[in-house]
Design a protein with these regions (language model features):
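ER/Golgi luminal nucleotide-sugar-dependent glycosyltransferases, focusing on the catalytic module
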Residues: 1-274
Length: 274
């Protein structure tokens, strides 16, 4: 059994960014762990201004799948890499959200981009975990965004550092808990950070079997009450973990999301607006 499956998920943002490419290469080169790399990405990218109704949605762009795939394979030794057509999410959103007219505050079924940006990362996570389970045996799966920048001073053994507690503590491996960068309260609602997740074997099935539909259920529950969190995805993630009796353990690692025209050498924390 290998130590870690590193699973990239979601939209293929900044795939050709030199800083990010060097970061991931460096992490894999210096780790002492036995790591396989997997990826599940979408055929589109989009950027949004955070808002409760998504009225400020920025246009979606289709990527050159062949070039993106070649670029990724040139950068890292992916054991399996899938870039899937984003339209599959449109079908899932229609199936899971069409009965809930209140969810239009977030997902407008006439604007596919809104559904893809809301539910896409969870379907991508489910598929990525399935890829890892089908092609190897691992103690831990690290689910992570490609465009996540780690503090450059802490590149040394990043993968080792964020997984150590789960690998060294046999009790921890058997416990139902995941590692996350943060759990917090925003506008009175609890959220669990969804940029990076450390998933031990005890929790593999929760992320590989019904994750997309389960998160959809949590999102429908959010829109059944007047109070709504700013971060719908992260509040749905919190509800999903609580419903399945999965605890959280904080991962102590400074990181942030890469943005266009971003200078990664100028450190800012946090870089998101609430």
């Amino acid at each position: 059994m290998k130590d870690v499956a590193l699973v990239f998920y979601g939209q293929p943002r900044a795939i050709d960014n030199d800083f990010l490419r060097n970061q991931w290469k460096n992490m894999l080169d210096i780790t002492n762990l036995d790591v396989d790399v997997y990826g599940h990405f979408w055929s589109t990218t989009s950027n949004t201004n955070i808002s409760k109704t998504y009225e400020n949605f920025v246009k979606e762009q289709t990527v050159d799948v062949k070039n993106i795939k070649n670029s990724l394979l040139e950068c890292l030794p992916f054991k399996k890499l899938v870039i899937e057509d984003s339209s599959i999410i449109d079908e899932i959103c229609n199936r899971n959200f069409s009965h809930n007219r209140f969810i239009k505050r977030r997902v407008d079924l006439n604007n596919p981009s809104t559904g893809r940006a809301t539910l896409g990362q969870w379907y991508s996570t489910q598929k990525g975990v399935q890829l890892a389970n089908a092609n190897g045996e691992y103690k831990i799966i690290v689910r992570v965004r490609w465009d996540l920048i780690f503090n450059a001073e802490r590149w040394v053994k990043v993968i080792d550092n964020i997984t150590r507690d789960f690998l060294e503590d046999e009790y921890g491996i058997k416990m139902q808990h995941i590692g996350t960068l943060d759990v917090s309260i925003v506008e009175g609602q609890p959220i669990v950070n969804d940029w990076l997740t450390i998933i031990p074997r005890s929790c593999f099935e929760f992320f590989s079997e019904n994750l997309t539909d389960d998160i959809s259920t949590m999102m429908n529950s959010i829109f059944s009450v007047p109070e709504m969190p700013l971060s719908v995805q992260e509040n749905a993630f919190y509800r999903f973990l609580k419903m399945n009796h999965i605890d959280t353990k904080k991962v102590h690692m400074n990181c942030r999301i890469h943005r266009e025209n971003d200078d990664p050498t100028k450190w800012r924390w946090p870089n998101f607006s609430i």
